[in-house]
Amino acid sequence: MDRQYFLILVVCVGLVANLSGAWGAEGDVPDFSGFWAGMFEPEDQQYRGPGPDFGDFRGLPLSEAGLAKAKSWNPDDDYLPENLSKPHSPTNIMRSSFPFEVIQEPDMITLRMESCEQVRRVHMGGVSHPPAETPHTFMGHSIGHWEGRTLVVHTTHIIENYVRRNGVAHSEEVQLEERYTRDGDYLLLMMTVEDPVYFSAPFMRVIAFRHRPDITDLRPYPCGE
C-alpha cells in the first residue's frame, strides 16, 4: 500500500472513531438531508473518468479468478449498445463526480444519484436482506442502522459489475459495508468491499463529500437497468 495513502487512511479512521464515539446518544442522529458532491484531487481523475491503465490493479487484493476476469476485459465492450447506459455498481458510483441527494426519513434513507439517475434505498429499523435467490439489481439491497452518529449501511444482491473501469470487477456475491459520518458541511464515507469470488481479502475506500446547498436539483443523466 502507498505510504501516503496509508497515512491518509489512518487519519480518516481516527476521525470516524472520534466522531462516532463522541457525539450524542443512540437516538440523537445527524441529518444527512440535502445535496452532496465528492471532493477529489486532480490525481484521483485517472481512477474515476476513463479509469486507470489496463493492468493497473495496484491496491486491490485480486484472487486468481479476479485477476483472470480483469485480464479478459476488452475496452471496446464498453461501447456496445447494451453497455453504453449501464449504471455503475455502488462500489463505484459513490466515487462519481456527479452530485447526489439524500432524503432522510426514520424508516428509509434514499440516495438519489445524478449518475445514471440511479436510486439507492437504505431500509432502516431492523429490516433484513431478502433470500439469497432473490434477483440482483445494479444498486442491490441495502439495510442500515445508526452507531452513535455514524450511519452504517450493508448492501447485498448487487449485479456483477466493475469496480474500476479497467476490467477489475466484483461478483454477485459481493457485500458492501459503508460508514457515513458527518462533520459540519463534510461527509466522510469509509467503504469496505468483500467478495469471496474475485478478491482474496476485503479492501477499503475512503471518500469525502461536501454539502452543496447551491444545488437545488439533479440534472437528467439517464441510464437503463
Regions found by a protein language model. Give the residues of each.
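Bacterial N-terminal signal peptides
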Residues: 8-18
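Bacterial N-terminal signal peptides that target proteins for export
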Residues: 1-9
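Hydrophobic small-molecule pocket/channel-lining residues, especially in calycin-type beta-barrels
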Residues: 2, 21-225
